[in-house]
Amino acid sequence: MITVGCAGFPVPATRYFREFLFVEVQETHLGKPGDGTVRRWRREAPDGFRFALLGPREVGQEGFRDGKVVETAMKTLLGVAKELEATTAVFVAPPDFPSSRANRTIVKDFLQMAKTKFDTVVFDPGPLWDPADIEPAATEAGALVVRDPLNQGPSKHPIAYYRLPGPAGHKSRYEDPAIERLAEIAKSLKHKEVTYVFTNVDMFADAKRFRKAMKL
């Protein structure tokens, strides 16, 4: 199964719901979305729509270490997950979070804890990590590691979660050759389940073009 969506709602939610059946909610990274907003999303979302939640930034700021701050942040996240019937959580490392043996162990312990609360747990290791360095630990914890298939190659696992950050950062868009290349890569893969999340400024248009190239 191939899922395509965006990081947040780049257009009004009612319009987004007409185009996609998946979104990675970004508001949960900064805090708890308003109760009215959450209820409206759930009410307006079509049948079969899936919400993933971006984990609280406090988790990364605390270095993924267990403690009261992380415990409180996770409790808030779980509350939103219950309202949206979300079973996927994505945790992003801060850009200055270094790759080290100690941090790999800490992240593994955190992912194991998160996996007891969410069916699918995803870790985006950030720019200082090679995804291959954390994948063994994440796999042991039952979690997925984010890759950019255009720059970091595809995942070798049957279930994969890709985030597309833009060819030159958040403010860039994918030109047609890049979309075509991404579609070629996607068509060649044999994942049982795979999710493609566009996170760049033109994510809505780029995700639609990718879906068209995939004939989805």
For the regions a protein language model found, what residue spans apply to each?
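Residues lining hydrophobic/aromatic ligand-binding pockets adjacent to catalytic sites
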Residues: 1-216
